[in-house]
């Protein structure tokens, strides 16, 4: 049981309701944890990760790379599985990066956050920022590079 009030959570998910930003307390293998959510999109993402269990966890993951971390929900999933897990997060959006750091306050020493994008190429970028931050993207400004 992840949510303390499952029926209220289902209602909020279906009707995209609830007040934001808000702090959500939830049950994890390490006990009670909390996360800051900033939109109903964040709440929906939280439910996909924590309730639908989109990630396979086998108690072997010690180092996690979270590329495009957004506000850190995926990283928090891994950090709440084991006290031995360390997460390296990469998030280029300034707004999301600040939210991510706030969400990691309970995990000092177990995460490393970088305000950077990750690519196999070096290029100047244009950030396409979407209001919730869930659908942000990066575009190469040099049209001669693929």
Indicate residue ranges for each PLM-predicted region.
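Phosphate/nucleotide-binding beta-alpha loop and adjacent structural elements of enzyme active sites
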Residues: 1-146
């Amino acid at each position: 049981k992840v949510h303390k009030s499952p029926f209220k959570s289902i209602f909020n998910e279906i009707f995209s309701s609830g007040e934001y930003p808000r702090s959500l307390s939830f049950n994890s293998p390490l006990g009670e944890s909390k996360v800051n959510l900033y939109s109903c999109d964040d709440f929906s993402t939280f439910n996909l990760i924590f309730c639908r269990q989109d990630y396979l966890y086998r108690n072997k993951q010690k180092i996690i790379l979270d590329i495009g971390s957004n506000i850190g929900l995926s990283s928090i999933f891994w950090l709440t599985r084991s006290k031995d897990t360390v997460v390296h997060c990469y998030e280029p959006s300034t707004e999301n990066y600040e939210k991510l750091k706030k969400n990691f306050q309970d995990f000092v020493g177990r995460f490393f956050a970088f305000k950077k994008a990750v690519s196999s190429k070096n290029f100047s970028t244009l950030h396409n920022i979407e209001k919730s931050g869930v659908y942000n993207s990066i575009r190469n400004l040099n049209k001669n590079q693929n």
